UniProtKB/Swiss-Prot annotation:
Gene3D superfamilies: 3.30.300.10, 3.40.50.880, HUPs. The keyword Ligase applies. It comes from Mycobacterium tuberculosis (strain CDC 1551 / Oshkosh). It comes from the Bacteria. Residues 16-205 form the Glutamine amidotransferase type-1 domain. This is GMP synthase [glutamine-hydrolyzing]. Pathway: Purine metabolism; GMP biosynthesis; GMP from XMP (L-Gln route): step 1/1. GO terms for molecular function: ATP binding; GMP synthase activity. Catalyzes the synthesis of GMP from XMP. The lineage of its organism: Bacteria, Bacillati, Actinomycetota, Actinomycetes, Mycobacteriales. PROSITE patterns: GATASE_TYPE_1 (PS51273), GMPS_ATP_PPASE (PS51553).
Length: 525
């Protein structure tokens, strides 16, 4: 048997609540909700061995939902040894059913399915104490627990689930058939908090100040007396990562900012002014706009543009690093990788590789770096909170997500200097009006897209025009995995449309994209 001492255990700022992922679309969301209760959490696949889980020294376990039936061939199984670790356990949906089955309860095909909003009847217990006796919850199940394990109290039911929740408070075990992690379960966060703080007895220690202090100490330990390079993009992730490292090692960090000419209005000046003023970091700016535009000439295909921009960025960054080092040595490269990136890339923990994430990828072989990724355990909202804790200005911390290829993938068609200027002007108007209307905190991001290869007929003054359309794509989201279009007030949309068609040359039409994700992605390209 593999002993815990033989297992590579990732360094974390605190002992985690482990979310055991049984294939749920909401596993990351569960981890986020646990952290919103000020408790550190991580996602681990159900294929992890009991030795691996024990080695992580969890303070509690949450068993996630999943698409399978506990009776199906090849369905994920719950190792009963998990329930003997002596830590509190909460089962959700499939995890609830697997938990019930492992403990001797009965899971059956009742013939009644529940998908979507369902009425939950609270029958007592501690998990739902002080909450409404009848409350809406979000269900997604075909099978149901029809008999709780011995020693468990049935504390809730629904039309399709005679046992919709059970608990054994003295054993610190509980489970719910519904999804407390989704916004469609209004009291779900209270139920999760009740489990974490009352059942598990965990304190609220996962705070921005504690996170920042722990990460700074980790970086200080990793880099020691070494030197580091950080590629700044102008976005919040790289800015906060750089600020943490700068706080840890001071002037032994050098930041490189590549201006590829595809930035939004004022972004280069903002980085040079606000970031340096807030951190005191050494910053080297590379003006590569002309090089990027030359490389993009004649290219309209979205993937082709992405590859060219990525390749040119690597070359510009490589040249800047060589100039900065000038014969000296920097052993570490700082990247703003976030926790969703780690999970989606496989995370080294047996999960499927959905996509690769690299802030700076494909560096030449003779540039040898050890990666420093101080944010790799954080979600976006936590990154913003840490940034505020470090004193970064709101102009950086509250910045909407912006793609690495910049405006290059918000121009549908070939990228030219004139088209970039047109889109940049329209984008600045949209940002000004949304900020003036107080909508920045309601919108995850608002891509502004130029349909450069499309023209439409219009009338301005006494003449006929033949101009380009601009597309507004305001979306609301928590993590960009799913998104809904934001209901921007009509009067704000009217001001935006009027200003763009009056102030931006060759644009005579503004349209609104009202498609959710899925089926559409947030960006057009």
């Amino acid at each position: 048997m593999v002993q815990p001492a033989d297992i590579d255990v990732p360094e974390t700022p605190a002992r985690p609540v482990l979310v055991v992922d049984f294939g749920a679309q909401y596993a990351q969301l569960i981890a986020r909700r646990v952290r919103e209760a000020r408790v550190f959490s991580e996602v681990i696949p159900h294929t992890a061995s009991i030795e691996e889980i024990r080695a992580r020294q969890p303070v509690a376990l949450v068993l996630s939902g999943g698409p399978a039936s506990v009776y199906a061939d090849g369905a994920p199984k719950l190792d009963p040894a998990l329930l003997d670790l002596g830590v509190p356990v909460l089962g959700i949906c499939y995890g609830f059913q697997a938990m019930a089955q492992a403990l001797g309860g009965i899971v059956a095909h009742t013939g009644t399915r529940e998908y979507g909003r369902t009425e939950l009847k609270v029958l007592g217990g501690k998990l739902h104490s002080d909450l409404p006796e009848v409350q809406p919850v979000w269900m997604s199940h075909g099978d149901a627990v029809t008999a709780a394990p011995d020693g468990f109290d049935v504390v809730a039911s629904s039309a399709g689930a005679p046992v919709a929740a059970f608990e054994a408070f003295d054993r610190r075990l509980a489970g719910v058939q519904y999804h407390p992690e989704v916004m469609h379960t209004p009291h779900g966060q209270q139920v999760l908090s009740r489990f974490l703080h009352d059942f598990a007895g965990l304190g609220a220690q996962w705070t921005p100040a504690n996170i920042a202090n722990a990460l700074i100490e980790q970086v200080r330990t990793q880099i020691g007396d070494g030197h580091a390079i950080c590629g700044l993009s102008g976005g919040v992730d790289s800015a906060v990562a750089a600020a943490l490292v700068q706080r840890a090692i001071g002037d032994r960090l050098t930041c490189v900012f590549v201006d590829h000419g595809l930035l939004r209005a004022g972004e280069r000046a903002q980085v040079q002014r606000d970031f340096v003023a807030a951190t005191g970091a050494n910053l080297v700016t590379v003006d590569a706009a002309e090089t990027f535009l030359e490389a993009l000439s004649g290219v309209s295909a979205p993937e082709g543009k992405r590859k060219i921009i990525g390749r040119q960025f690597i070359r510009a960054f490589e040249g800047a690093v060589r100039d900065v080092l000038d014969g000296k040595t920097a052993e570490f490269l700082v990247q703003g990788t976030l926790y969703p990136d780690v999970v989606e890339s496989g995370g080294g923990s047996g999960t499927a590789n959905i996509k690769s994430h690299h802030n700076v990828g494909g560096l030449p072989d003779d540039l040898k770096f050890t990666l420093v990724e101080p944010l790799r355990l954080l979600f976006k909202d936590e990154v913003r909170a840490v940034g505020r804790e470090l004193g970064l200005p709101e102009e950086i911390v509250a910045r909407q997500p912006f793609p690495g290829p910049g405006l290059g993938i918000r121009i549908v068609g070939e990228v030219t200097a004139k088209r970039v200027d047109t889109l940049r002007h329209a984008d600045s108007i949209v940002r000004e009006e949304l900020t003036a209307a107080g909508l920045d905190n309601q919108i995850w991001q608002c891509p502004v897209v130029l349909l450069a290869d499309v023209r439409s007929v219009g009338v301005q003054g006494d003449g006929r025009t033949y101009g380009h359309p601009i597309v507004l794509r305001p979306v609301s989201s928590e993590d960009a995995m799913t998104a809904d279009w934001t209901r921007v007030p009509y009067e704000v949309l009217e001001r935006i449309s009027t200003r763009i068609t009056n102030e931006v040359a060759e644009v005579n039409r503004v349209v609104l994209d009202i498609t959710s994700k899925p089926p559409a992605t947030i960006e057009w390209e």
